[in-house]
Regions:
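Outer-membrane beta-barrel pore domains
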Residues: 2-3, 17, 38, 57-69, ...
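Outer membrane beta-barrel
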Residues: 3, 49, 53-59, 65-192, ...
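N-terminal periplasmic/intermembrane-space "pro-region" immediately following the signal or transit peptide
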Residues: 1-55
Length: 353
């Protein structure tokens, strides 16, 4: 095409453009009104987003605590934009047990629960989440509750939580928990210090000091020290002094990313955790009466006498295809002051859509 032919096309377009301008001027009010309605419609269409997750898992426990079940968890997440600074998140959750039971003596289909409902935004420079959500610092507590999370800062981040547990798990149900923490980095080492105060029957107070850093590409070493105190009731139940200091060390390589097929990771942890140094860590949260059901202790007194647990956990995960991640874990834990032990093999495939 010559430049002259191109100029002819441009001239025709300009002529049509002039006609469009005239029509736009004539129907300015109507177009204005229509434009507002269309813009608002488009904005509202993007205002709510629904995503989902299917989690199929199998757990087999041997040793003094024997149990097995196959569980299917279905979740729908509702995310809505309130304004430029605030959002809303809700979650519908259903559990089905193909075999075994849920640890509370029931099996089969569970009800559909609406178990997340919280808003997120900023008040000045403080980030806030408020409502019903999960409260998880994996080595000390992992429970759903009603409350508030606050965070301030970047290089040095100060955090604060206050919540009341509301899950089916007996531990922390209706107990108020307060958490304050500081997170920062010293060179390549990430450092976290947290203080926990829980209004449980033992009036738990826990201090957690955690360090983590890469020692080689994608290879991370972490270590944590815990100090926990309880009121006299725990020692009365145990019939002896309860230990107050615990520790954990872990090594991990890589990690599966749902958006990257073929990505994978492995890890290993070893821990020595007296009864006073945790509330409900993630590795115990799958048990309805955790922590004492883990080792088949039928009462809080039994758990106090056992004085917590020690042992190791190893695991691996891989992204099989985009948004499909498989994971497997093995725990071997025993009572610190008792004779009971439990071995748990746990596997899961997560589909995200």
């Amino acid at each position: 095409m010559t430049r002259y032919e191109m100029a002819q096309i441009v001239a025709k377009a300009m002529a049509k453009g002039a006609n469009v301008d005239k029509l736009a001027a004539e129907f300015a009010d109507e177009l204005d009104s229509l434009g507002v309605r269309v813009a608002n419609l488009e904005k509202k269409a993007d205002n709510v987003k629904i995503t989902g997750q299917i989690r199929a898992s199998y757990k087999d426990v041997s040793g003094d605590k024997k149990d097995n079940n196959m569980r299917l968890r279905s979740r729908l997440f509702v995310n809505g934009t309130i304004n430029d600074d605030w959002t809303y998140t809700g979650r519908f959750h259903n559990e089905q047990y193909v075999n075994g039971n849920d640890g509370k003596g029931s099996a089969g289909e569970d009800d559909l629960d609406f178990n997340w409902a919280f808003v997120s935004g900023r008040v000045g420079g403080v980030k806030m989440d408020a409502g019903r959500m999960d409260f998880t610092y994996a080595d000390v507590v992992d429970v759903r509750g009603d409350g508030v999370k606050l965070a301030y800062g970047d290089d040095v981040k100060v955090t604060g939580w206050v919540f009341k547990g509301n899950s089916d798990i007996e531990m922390l149900s209706d107990d108020r928990v307060y958490v304050a923490g500081v997170e920062t980095s010293f060179g390549a080492v990430d450092t976290t210090v947290r203080y926990y105060r829980a209004d449980t029957e033992f009036d738990n107070e826990i201090v957690e000091v955690a360090l983590a850093g890469e020692i080689a590409k994608d290879l991370t070493l972490r270590g944590t020290w815990f100090n926990g105190t309880t009121d006299d009731k725990a020692e009365t139940l145990a019939g002896t002094d309860v230990d107050t200091n615990g520790w954990l060390v872990g090594l991990s390589y890589g990690g599966a990313k749902a958006s990257e097929p073929g990505s994978w990771g492995v890890y290993a942890n070893y821990s020595d955790r007296p009864f006073a140094t945790y509330l409900l860590p993630t590795n115990l949260s799958g048990y309805a009466d955790a922590p004492y059901a883990l080792l088949n202790e039928s009462s809080v007194a039994g758990a106090a006498k056992a004085d917590g647990y020690e042992g190791y956990e190893i695991g691996a995960n891989v992204t099989l295809a985009k948004n499909i991640v498989a994971a497997v874990k093995y725990f071997d834990l025993e009572e610190r002051e008792g004779s009971k032990d439990a071995q748990t093999l746990w596997s899961e495939v997560v589909f995200t859509f």
